[in-house]
Amino acid sequence: MSAKFEISFSKSVKLNGGLAILLKTAEADSAAGAETADPAGVIAKAAKIARFSAKSMATLDIVAPEGAPVERIVVVGIGKVGELTAHDWLKAGGAAASKVKNTDKVAIFIDVPGLETDARAAADFALGMLLRAYSFDAYKTKKNDDEEKSAKSVKVTIVTADATGARKAFSESEAIAGGVNLARDLVNEPPNALGPVEFAARAKELENLGVEVEILTEKEMRRLGMGALLGVAQGSVRPPRLAVMQWKGGKAKDRPVAFVGKGVVFDTGGISIKPAAGMEDMKGDMGGAAAVTGLMHVLAARKAAVNAVGIIGLVENMPDGNAQRPGDIVTSMSGQTIEVINTDAEGRLVLCDALWYCSDRFKPQFMINLATLTGAIVVALGNVHAGLFSNDDQLSAQLTAAGLSTNEKLWRMPLGKDYDKLIDSKFADMKNTGGRQAGSITAAHFLKRFVQDTPWAHLDIAGTAMGSPQDEINQSWGSGFGVRLLDELVRANCESR
């Protein structure tokens, strides 16, 4: 359960107990709000003793002296003014949220002397608090003291000169936090609780925000000829689903932008079974579908002025007596045939039918797919960058810029004919793996054969969607990577107003 912050904005606040959090730059002599929260001047003395330099995200925790208007004071350093970025405001909010303990009210002063704080910065700070506050403990029957206290509501007042503007900007921050935390929830859920049917039901709940949601059953997918996706699903007793989400916030004549997610709710590898060690993490093999679902939540919640489609292919890859075998040949919705070399290269089989369906039905301006697709991308990029593959330089540049803006970083990887020929098959139109070399690239080339002439990008998020290092705004195993990135892409390039 996430900590419950009731966040409001005000030009001033009357302090009466609780916690005061003050921001400080490295250059400033005093912290924001020091004259209000610290009339006795204890911050300067404590900072000198602790050698607190206000470097970025450093914190100083002080028990307020008797007679002070608050019980505790926390100073959060935000570094040098000239080096402060938009993402640093999120990090500062996260650092502040980590210090909210044993209190039900917090006043936060963010208008640092010498630094003009705008409404967007204040809203980003609040977003950082909401993202840091997330935790997933739905299945714990016994909680420690901190977990019990996090369930209680905390009133947070952020003091800033442009309180009205911050309040307006924060409505979008709440939408973003809702989408990111939805994606985190989906990735963190245990696989016995979140099968294809259950995941589709969670997507269906977006209708409450105005999203149109269709759920295609196995029978309907078979009628459409989705033999690649259905081949992956045939080893599981849990039936597959394809969820189609539409947000119609743009002009009726405008073609939609489209996002497609891999939703393998649990991946054993199938007949080409994975090693036992770490297999439990394969509950997160639907991180792409989770990100697409979270994005659709954000677009609807903030009433984005765009037409957007989100499609997620939901299957479970299991090795029963009916499972797909290495050597099988399946026919995709496109009519192209695929030789299955490795049943653990299943995500691309799910995506190829979803991509073709999306392109054929919606004729989108562009398609972006997200998938925890290959271990090879983790070897290449670790968990700092996601891999970016694209047939369109403009779309690639826009995605890269959005990644830098949100700190959800992408690194463009190569495509080329010499790689594409590695997936040619002797027995079918193509095979589903090209061998050990260039594994993430040949996987991207496989997908590229199903996008037709649509501008397209493939994000391989295997290293960033789950198990990434924890930081100021993410303490969760499932990170929600991709939601903020794609929302920024839409906001910067696609909205009609």
Curated annotation (Swiss-Prot):
Q: How is the cofactor bound?
A: Binds 2 manganese ions per subunit.
CDD domains in the record, alphabetically? Answer: Peptidase_M17
- According to its UniProt entry, this protein's organism is Rhizobium etli (strain ATCC 51251 / DSM 11541 / JCM 21823 / NBRC 15573 / CFN 42)
Q: What is its EC number?
A: 3.4.11.1, 3.4.11.10
Which cofactors is this protein said to need?
A: Mn(2+)
Sites where the protein binds Mn(2+) 1: D267, D344, E346
Q: Which residues bind Mn(2+) 2?
A: K262, D267, D285, E346
The entry assigns this protein to a family as follows: Belongs to the peptidase M17 family.
The GO biological-process annotations, alphabetized, read as:
proteolysis
- Record protein name field: Probable cytosol aminopeptidase
Q: Which HAMAP family does the entry link to?
A: Cytosol_peptidase_M17
NCBIfam families cross-referenced by the UniProt entry: PRK00913.1-2, PRK00913.1-4, PRK00913.2-2, PRK00913.2-4, PRK00913.3-5
- UniProt entry keywords in alphabetical sequence: Aminopeptidase, Cytoplasm, Hydrolase, Manganese, Metal-binding, Protease
The reaction(s) annotated as catalysed by this protein in its Swiss-Prot or TrEMBL entry are: Release of an N-terminal amino acid, Xaa-|-Yaa-, in which Xaa is preferably Leu, but may be other amino acids including Pro although not Arg or Lys, and Yaa may be Pro. Amino acid amides and methyl esters are also readily hydrolyzed, but rates on arylamides are exceedingly low; Release of an N-terminal amino acid, preferentially leucine, but not glutamic or aspartic acids
What are the positions of the active site? K274, R348
For this UniProt entry, what is the primary localization, expressed as one broad class?
A: cytoplasm
Q: Per the record, GO CC terms?
A: cytoplasm
List the molecular function annotations (GO) for this entry.
Answer: manganese ion binding; metalloaminopeptidase activity
